Amino acid sequence: MVIAVYPGTFDPMTRGHEDLVRRASNIFDELVVGVAHSPNKRPFFSLEERIGIAREVLGHYPNVRVEGFSGLLKDFVRNNNARVIVRGLRAVSDFEYEFQMAGMNRYLLPDVETMFLTPSDQYQFISGTFVREIAVLGGDVSKFVFPSVERWLQEKIGKPE
């Protein structure tokens, strides 16, 4: 049984994230979506909210589990007996950071592979940062996130649906 971990801040979970989860869940026996605490990123949603959002969006996948974590990714990977780390690459700008991170993870976890997936064409430009900014400024994010995520955003911002 091959277990993979897909770590991220998921602030919020977008259609691009779900696209990668859907595709990775078809490759691995079990996919653990690791929602990172990431206090240095100053997330818009709390860790508990981000876990709740991810569980709402991904709850229909039978082999996907959503867990929060803080600390080193290597510890989360080991605690879940994972053999693969899944990462998404939207553009060349993501590659340099992800390449360095994969190298560090290989050093810390020599028996764990990093697998890069690119999003489907319609999701290549979506980022949580863009979604939050558009939502805060009153724009329509319905093409980028699921209805439940849009509701979470509207509640957090304090705007009616």
UniProtKB/Swiss-Prot annotation:
Its EC number is 2.7.7.3. The record marks 17 as: Transition state stabilizer. Keywords: ATP-binding, Coenzyme A biosynthesis, Cytoplasm, Magnesium, Nucleotide-binding, Nucleotidyltransferase, Transferase. Pathway: Cofactor biosynthesis; coenzyme A biosynthesis; CoA from (R)-pantothenate: step 4/5. Pfam families: CTP_transf_like. GO terms for molecular function: ATP binding; pantetheine-phosphate adenylyltransferase activity. The keyword Magnesium applies. It is found in: Cytoplasm. Its main location: cytoplasm. Its cofactor is Mg(2+). One of its GO terms (cellular component) is cytoplasm. One of its GO terms (biological process) is coenzyme A biosynthetic process. ATP binds at residues 9-10, 17, 88-90, 98, 123-129. Substrate binds at residues 9, 41, 73, 87. It comes from the Bacteria. The keyword Nucleotide-binding applies. It catalyses: (R)-4'-phosphopantetheine + ATP + H(+) = 3'-dephospho-CoA + diphosphate. InterPro entries: Cyt_trans-like, PPAT, Rossmann-like_a/b/a_fold. Belongs to the bacterial CoaD family. PANTHER family: PHOSPHOPANTETHEINE ADENYLYLTRANSFERASE. Reversibly transfers an adenylyl group from ATP to 4'-phosphopantetheine, yielding dephospho-CoA (dPCoA) and pyrophosphate. Homohexamer. HAMAP family: PPAT_bact. NCBIfam families: coaD_prev_kdtB, cyt_tran_rel. This is Phosphopantetheine adenylyltransferase. It comes from Cupriavidus necator (strain ATCC 17699 / DSM 428 / KCTC 22496 / NCIMB 10442 / H16 / Stanier 337) (Ralstonia eutropha).
